[in-house]
Amino acid sequence: MKAITLRQPAGLENLRLVDLPDPGQPGAGEIRVRVHASSLNFHDLGVVTGRMPSADGRIPMSDGAGVVEAVGEGVDEFAVGDAVVSRFFPSWLDGGPTIADFATVPGDGVDGYARDTVVRPAHWFTHAPRGYSHAEAATLTTAGLTAWRALVVDARLKAGDTVLVLGTGGVSIFALQFAKHMGATVIATSSSDEKLARAQALGADFTINYRRDTDWAAKVLDCTNGRGVDVVIEVGGPDTLGQSIQACRIGGHIALIGVLTGIAGQVPTVALMQRHQTLQGLIVGSRSHQRDMVRALDATGIKPVVDQTFALEDIADAFAHQAAGKHFGKLCLSI
């Protein structure tokens, strides 16, 4: 079996292409999956660069998509030949979150999907949307489901609402697409006019270059006639949260998803209180959420934006490209 392992000390130079024993046939309740694609997330980047400690020899990548090759006894949800996509929190099936760490997350606490074959419990997967390539399906595990949960489950977005998406990475572009299909107005930010033009082509109603307009919260208020947005997709963290609060309407919802500007910082609590806003942290979602999202994608025909696909053996180059921040949407691996 072809796989990538991460040797310690972590770093892109310590990602190794290796041959490992075949995982064998599935036992009761398990499926064997030929993995064809994965997609890169900043969580994965944190693991492979050592910002998030992992075991020596860990197989990285939390996202995986492929085809069922065999099913174990008692599995009736999947059949040989089904296209499937992995899940971020394998044990979170339904209901509210009960997990606050990454001990069970593939590519972090357990081995991930940078390999060509896995045998896993069937509930670690859902069906992939109809008509999706494996690379497109792989983008759903983390980025797609995070955007879905933020807008649909937590913020309860409805037609006529206004959404602010920060940046043009995987989660933000999914949020833009989901919000537009739900009848919302979308404001997108980026430091690149080229990326903003691409966001506009996807349906963004307003665009703001935050490098040129450093007081971008004021620009958001201009776009909303002083009201502010109903929902903010906040991926920046401490350096952007203050302006996100100012850009959000009184009683609005801020989905705290990313920490691109740092893992800790001051929270303007008085402004948050005065504006009666909900600040909700979240990390991905449950199996039930993912199945709901897949049904919605089947119904709407929304397709992810895959910026570039790298071969598995070029995984270090893929992460270097991600770290440079030049991509729009998702980066994927072909396995």
Where are these regions (language model features)?
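C-terminal hydrophobic helical "lid"/dimerization subdomain
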Residues: 1, 7, 242, 287-335
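Short N-terminal strand-loop motif that marks the start
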Residues: 1-65, 120, 320-323, 334
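Glycine-rich beta-strand-centered segment in the early N-terminal region that forms part
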Residues: 23-38, 48-93, 109-112, 129-132
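NAD(P)H dinucleotide-binding glycine-rich loop of Rossmann-like/cofactor-binding domains
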Residues: 89-166
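Glycine-rich phosphate-binding loop and adjacent beta-alpha segment
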Residues: 102-103, 235-305, 335
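Adenosine-nucleotide cofactor-binding segment
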Residues: 162-168, 180-243
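N-terminal Rossmann-fold NAD(P) dinucleotide-binding loop
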Residues: 172-173
